[in-house]
Regions:
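Conserved N-terminal entry element of GNAT/NAT acetyltransferase domains
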Residues: 1-25, 29, 33
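Helix-loop element at the rim of GNAT/NAT acetyltransferase active sites that forms part
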Residues: 28-44
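Active-site rim helix/loop that mediates acceptor-substrate recognition in acyltransferases
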Residues: 41-65, 69-71, 75, 79-82
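Conserved acyl-donor/pantetheine-binding loop and adjacent beta-alpha core of acyl/acetyltransferases
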Residues: 79-116, 173-176
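Conserved acetyl-CoA-binding loop-helix of GNAT-fold acetyltransferases
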Residues: 114-119, 123-136, 156-160
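Short glycine/proline-centered loop/turn elements that form peptide/ligand docking sites
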Residues: 127, 131, 150-154, 170-177
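Conserved GNAT acetyl-CoA-binding A-motif
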Residues: 136-150
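Conserved catalytic-core motifs of GNAT/GCN5-like acyltransferases
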Residues: 144-146, 164-179
Length: 192
């Protein structure tokens, strides 16, 4: 676990599989609190799906969970894993990417699967700190994530942090939005 105290009361920590599994209930509650609000408007099926797949994700090689706490209260999170060589991440894109771009080694690209900060804690840099900590220790050359096109504010934040859209992808239920933008960050935090 990496521990970075940001203020007297705020702490950023990165966890591996075992710690992530112990925090699963807390992370799933945070996910629901973040993604039940506009513009995401998550539903019960999405939240049940996230609770079901989080433990499976935590067991993937290279999985990382980064959390933010203010005192004892968890206020934000981000998690993901390196894309395996046989990934389907780059398939079913509306605008296909070339073979070289889509080639994965198991360490080339870190996929940010879910990421969020409680609404009353946004705008204070918490999200950026989670983002940088999660990615800087991943060992990957680049990162990718998906974001709903209607999440205009979120997309703008990612753009300011250096992410760019490479395509969009149709998602399967119970994901609430059928279409997601696929973004890539090619200059990882710590390399800037």
């Amino acid at each position: 676990m990496t521990d970075r105290t940001l203020t007297d009361e705020m702490t950023i920590e990165t966890h591996g599989c075992r710690e992530a599994l112990a925090l699963a209930g807390t992370i799933c509650d945070l996910y629901e609190a973040v993604f039940s609000l506009p513009p995401f408007n998550g539903n019960a099926a999405e939240f049940a799906n996230q609770r079901s797949y989080f433990p499976k994700l935590a067991e993937r090689p290279g999985f990382r969970l980064t959390t933010a706490r203010s005192g004892p209260e968890f206020i934000g999170f981000g998690y993901g894993y390196p894309l395996p060589a046989d990934t389907h991440w780059w398939s079913r894109l509306a605008e296909p990417v070339d073979e070289e771009f889509a080639a994965e080694t198991g360490t080339r690209t870190f996929a940010v699967i879910d990421y969020g900060v409680l609404s009353d804690r946004r705008g204070a840099g918490v999200g950026h700190r989670i983002h940088d900590e999660l990615l800087s220790g991943s060992g990957a050359e680049r990162a990718t994530l998906s974001v709903q096109p209607k999440a205009v504010r979120t997309r703008e934040i990612y753009r300011r942090w250096g992410w760019r859209k490479v395509s969009h992808k149709l998602m399967d239920p119970p994901i609430p939005a059928p279409l997601f933008d696929i973004l890539v960050l090619e200059e990882m935090p710590g390399a800037r």
